[in-house]
Amino acid sequence: EGLQHSRERARELLGIDPSVRLIGALGRLVPIKGHTYLLQAFAAIKDKYPATQLAIIGAGREESRLAAEIERLGLSGRAHLLGFRENALQYVRAFDIWTMPSLAEGLGLALLEGMSGHLPVIASNVPAMLPLIQGAGGLPITPADVPTLVAALDNYLGLSDEELKAKGEQAYRYLQEQHDIEVFRQEYLNLIDSGLNQARKEQP
């Protein structure tokens, strides 16, 4: 909790409009994270939800390809690649919906990061994550399947602010009950260390 900026401060630091609904993802920009499918799904519903934007925090070799995809899909100004951020968990509350469209996932730790920010979660139904998604009352999707991702986004974006917030609180309660926060924090700090080492390796 203490690690995270408020929604307003996080958005200010990231340069995101405080009034929009923000779909978020956090992770290395590599094919296995499935970001290209997230962009395609968002493109399919962007006109239905004009006050919604998408932001991805992370760096990686897919960055230029994802930037080109944003252009191709007509998402300029609506989808943002925010790059690598130190201690990315600080910015979780900038988002309103947490997405993890990964094609495969080892631990699914980033899913817990979203829950720690009181966010409703949409994530791939891979074995590491499915029990967490179900426990948190989130929406499981099929990896690399744009229609199921569109349906999940549409489901959450169709909710009122209060309903969406309630979904996020449900996810946070699950995290508190199932994953002791101190254990999670230690896992997270370990993740940060490995993430920073990885980022250093990936710098050109």
What residues fall within each predicted segment?
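A short helix/loop element that forms part of the nucleotide-sugar donor recognition site in Leloir-type
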Residues: 1-16, 162
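A short, well-ordered alpha-helix in the C-terminal region of glycosyltransferases
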Residues: 9-12, 163-177, 184-187
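Nucleotide-activated donor-binding/catalytic signature segment of Leloir-type glycosyltransferases, i.e.
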Residues: 67-83
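Aromatic "clamp/platform" in nucleotide-sugar-dependent glycosyltransferases that forms part
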Residues: 84, 103
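Short acidic/histidine- and often glycine-rich active-site loop of Leloir-type glycosyltransferases
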Residues: 112-113, 126-140
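Conserved acidic donor-binding segment of nucleotide-sugar-dependent glycosyltransferases
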Residues: 135, 139-147, 155-161
